[in-house]
Design a protein with these regions (language model features):
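Conserved acidic donor-binding loop of glycosyltransferase catalytic domains
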Residues: 387-388, 393
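Glycosyltransferase donor-sugar binding loop
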Residues: 149-153, 313-328
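Substrate-binding clefts and catalytic carboxylate motifs of secreted carbohydrate-active enzymes
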Residues: 286-297
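Alpha-helical solenoid repeat scaffolds of the TPR/TPR-like class and their adjacent stem/linker regions
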Residues: 1-282, 300, 328, 332-339, ...
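Hinge/capping helix and adjacent helix->loop/strand transition within the periplasmic-binding protein
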Residues: 301-308
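Short alpha-helix at the nucleotide-sugar/activated-sugar donor binding site of glycosyltransferases
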Residues: 377-379, 402
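Short acidic/histidine- and often glycine-rich active-site loop of Leloir-type glycosyltransferases
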Residues: 394-405
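Short hydrophobic "strand-cap" motifs at the C-terminus of beta-strands
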Residues: 118, 288-290, 317, 347
Length: 473
């Protein structure tokens, strides 16, 4: 994978194909090739390669993780087709899932519940902006908080989270079986997955059912784990609209709150600047998403917007585009869609808010929406257009907009998406006003009310626990 990390896309692809032809590490090579292809938007070939890899090594959980991860981004598969693959994952390695809890205390009516969080992102990552506020605001008079953390690089976020825990277990080198034993020994009541199928996850521990109650919270992965061993999927009515609950292996628990997460901005973000279009003389659309979300449907839709808004530009900025070869691949894709290179600014800059200051209107991706960068758009005064697509990964953008009271930027078709983007760009005076109002609106919204959100979350944990006790009685 080193060539891929260095931006040598063609060389990496050739290396993987040669390894496959020589029958060298064939399954892992096919899985790596698949991920590389999906990153370039070649989903049909990529998914076919990874399915072949699974046929060669059906018990390889890492390949299964990559397979399910890539499926979420496919622009052509239906939600039902994708969920079928998740159900197949549930049948893997189903042994050792018999409940085996130690010291489940049911005699006392009121006691501290022990909550355990399993995550590999308890450091300065995009997901930590949602996770850190939970740890900071937990009521430790009512709950004991434990972190089961895989953190290669400890930083100030790690220290902050750790300081609000009653217990911290480093799980880097622990097997799922050993971790399950540790969780049982500590008497954890409710175990929370914060990673889903992202790299380095510890989903395997949940197959052992080491705690009486378990749930997966959408912020780390965005969709079902596929594991029936996990009791609940924590979301809300926007992410999982009525009638779509059957697309989740877990029972969907919709939080009784305007949104199912809370966001703490990076303290270094800085202030909101004036609308760039006022000095540029043209509208700049933009995204900070990874390349895997930029499928042909998205590119066609964005190209139609650029064609309809005279002299407009598009910024595409993320770590996938730090090297020239990936830039050229997507410049060519837009060229085929009728957009010349001089209207594109593709690259990578950090921190993200410096790029966001150059953007007038954000464009969300579909069928898998963007995540943290959408909230950062809003915090920097940038409205964005999103397409409400399949649950729940395709409704993240809608979730944030509903939380701050701007559902008018949610589209329900690609045609409506184009129309909304064009309408928003047509009135610079209104767009400038929106830019200055968005941060105060967001700060006053449920998305920024940390204490209130965590209070509702804790009430949810207590309700889940009461349901367990009722079943056990």
């Amino acid at each position: 994978m080193s060539q891929n990390k260095m931006g040598k896309i063609t060389a990496a692809e050739d290396t993987f194909r040669k390894a496959i032809s020589l029958d060298f590490a064939k399954a892992p090579s096919k899985a790596n090739l698949a991920y590389l292809l999906c990153d370039q938007g070649h989903f049909d070939e990529g998914i076919n390669e990874i399915q072949t890899a699974l046929a060669l090594d059906k018990d390889n959980l890492k390949i299964h993780d990559n397979f399910l991860f890539c499926l979420n981004y496919s622009p052509d598969l239906s939600a039902e087709e994708i969920y079928t693959c998740y159900k197949n994952f549930d049948n893997l390695d189903s042994k050792n899932t018999t409940p085996k809890w130690l010291r489940v205390q049911t005699s006392k009516k009121k006691r501290k519940l022990k909550i355990g969080y399993v995550s590999g992102e308890l450091s300065k990552t995009s997901v930590s902006r949602f996770i850190e506020p939970i740890f900071i605001n937990h009521d430790q008079k009512q709950f004991e908080i434990y972190a089961f953390a895989k953190v290669p690089n400890h930083d100030y976020i790690t220290s902050s989270i750790k300081s609000h825990c009653d217990g911290w277990v480093n799980i880097d080198e622990m097997s799922p079986k050993d971790l399950a034993s540790k969780i049982r020994d500590l008497g954890i009541d409710i175990l929370v997955d914060l990673a889903g199928h992202v790299q380095g996850n510890k989903l395997g521990v949940f197959r052992y059912k080491p705690a009486p109650v378990s749930l997966s919270w959408w912020v780390g992965f965005g969709y079902t784990t596929g594991l029936s061993a996990i009791d609940y999927f924590l979301a809300d009515k926007t992410l999982v609209p009525k009638g779509s609950e059957h697309l989740f292996a877990e029972k969907v628990w919709k939080l009784d709150h305007p949104c199912s997460t809370v966001f703490r901005p990076d303290p270094n973000t800085g202030s909101v600047n004036a609308l760039p279009a006022l000095t540029n003389g043209f509208i700049t659309f933009g995204t900070l998403t990874r390349s895997i979300r930029l499928n042909d449907r998205v590119i066609k839709t964005w190209a139609n917007i650029l064609k309809k808004v005279p002299n407009s530009r598009l910024i595409i900025n993320s770590i996938n585009f730090r090297y020239d070869e990936m830039k050229e691949i997507f410049i060519e894709k837009f060229k085929k869609a009728g957009i010349s290179q001089d209207r594109l600014d593709i690259g990578y800059d950090s921190p993200p808010w410096n790029v966001l200051r150059k953007i007038d209107i954000g464009l969300d991706c579909f069928p898998h929406n963007s995540g943290t960068t959408l909230v950062e758009h809003l915090y920097m005064g940038n409205p964005y257009i999103t397409l409400a697509d399949r649950p729940s990964v395709g409704r993240i953008g809608s979730h944030y907009l509903n939380a701050i009271g701007h559902g008018e930027w949610i589209a329900h078709s690609e045609e409506e998406y184009v129309e909304k983007a064009c309408d928003l760009s047509a009135n610079l005076e209104n767009l400038s006003k929106i830019r200055q109002q968005l941060r105060p609106e967001m700060n006053a919204s449920p998305l920024r009310q940390e204490k209130d959100f965590v209070k509702h979350l804790e009430q949810t944990y207590q309700q889940m626990w009461n349901c367990f006790l009722a079943r056990k009685a």
